[in-house]
Swiss-Prot record:
It comes from the Bacteria. Residues 28-259 form the AB hydrolase-1 domain. Catalyzes the hydrolysis of 2-hydroxy-6-oxohepta-2,4-dienoate into 2-hydroxypenta-2,4-dienoate and acetate. Keywords: Aromatic hydrocarbons catabolism, Hydrolase, Serine esterase. Pfam families: Abhydrolase_1. It comes from Pseudomonas putida (strain ATCC 700007 / DSM 6899 / JCM 31910 / BCRC 17059 / LMG 24140 / F1). One of its GO terms (molecular function) is carboxylic ester hydrolase activity. Its EC number is 3.7.1.25. This is 2-hydroxy-6-oxo-2,4-heptadienoate hydrolase. Pathway: Xenobiotic degradation; toluene degradation. GO terms for biological process: toluene catabolic process.
Amino acid sequence: MTNVNAEIGRMVLAGGIETNLHDVGAGNPVVLVHGSGPGVTAWANWRTVMPELSRHRRVIAPDMVGFGFTQRPHGIHYGVESWVAHLAGILDALELDRVDLVGNSFGGALSLAFAIRFPHRVRRLVLMGAVGVSFELTDGLDAVWGYEPSVPNMRKVMDYFAYDRSLVSDELAELRYKASTRPGFQEAFASMFPAPRQRWVDALASSDQDIRDIRHETLILHGRDDRVIPLETSLRLNQLIEPSQLHVFGRCGHWVQIEQNRGFIRLVNDFLAAED
């Protein structure tokens, strides 16, 4: 009997990088850009929302370079420019001129940077618990980026993610720990955000003026009780992006798409269904 790993979709060559992505549904394309948790994959990030979102549109969820089952090129320098270039390469490989972007946390910073650099290739933006502006490094984000593989450390990271700690079972912590120790995963992850880590928050941030210049309709989502990316970042983005709306979920941490699954799907579906 074949053991099929649901985290592996199909491979495309994007900007010279063998890229694992999930491509489901039909219609207007939306690209889901995952966060930067240890052992993360697009599937792990978006599995709870892809079935519903893909009922009405084409949903593409790639593993960004350095993460998941996408190739890790020898000698690559991980940073905003390389990740944005990879995202552009994914769109080119799929022959997509213009897409909606949904970015989670680190993926929000990449989506924002992509919209600034390639405004003609983005229709609408959704930013969820996004980085994108500078803030003082939180204990939660320091724990995420400073993760060293062990089950207790993975549980600590996941406790920071969740408002409802009952979601963080021993089984889930063990599962994600195993994911973080797959060949090549931790080596690439450890090279991305070495201490001191405030500099990586600042490096992922776009300038206030560049953000002010964004003209895309933007939906900003955040958990009120987020201990990884502070709510103030989304308040700031809402102030800077003139055509934006902000929704704050109470009793919710950094896992908006999991802890407020139905609300996330409803808001994103309604927002992306609107005509410009």
